[in-house]
Amino acid sequence: MGAEQICNLFKDKIMNVEKLGSIAILDGDKFSDKEINSRIICLPGKKSIEELFFEYSKDLFENDIKNFWQDSFLEDNGYTRVWYRDNILVSIEQIDETAKKSNKDKRKINKKIFNNENYFPFFNKVIDFWIKDEKNEKVLKSFIKDFITVTKQLLQFYGILYNKLIIEKEEQ
């Protein structure tokens, strides 16, 4: 189901998904669809999650960020700069051409590359590094704030007091 259909479902007065106790988390490029009151939030960034991390991985490559490339997991599994250049970067740079030639949706091609079983462990490390990157702190805090807001709404829907959960956790 696409973001547009999800938004329509969540905003539909007849379906009244708010009464179903659900939240929706969309890609960052769907930011205009964000509606906290309808429990719709967006992932950080103003792009699809795939494009965000394709771009970030290219930045890590082009700037030769040593503390990323020297990660023991990456080194132990052969995810070197050369491997990235010869495999993932080539795939990323061919997305527009592939979409044009195959008449496929660019978004689907992005997802296929991002979720490729050979690339996914690499992208997990890219995501981890992005989360820890101080440059992303502001956008992450905004997402976390939105996530907490919709989570509180969901807890309230189910009759669970958020403050009670915090107190119980602190007592453990």
How should each PLM-predicted stretch be described?
Residues 1-172:
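Acidic, Mg2+-coordinating catalytic modules of nucleic-acid enzymes
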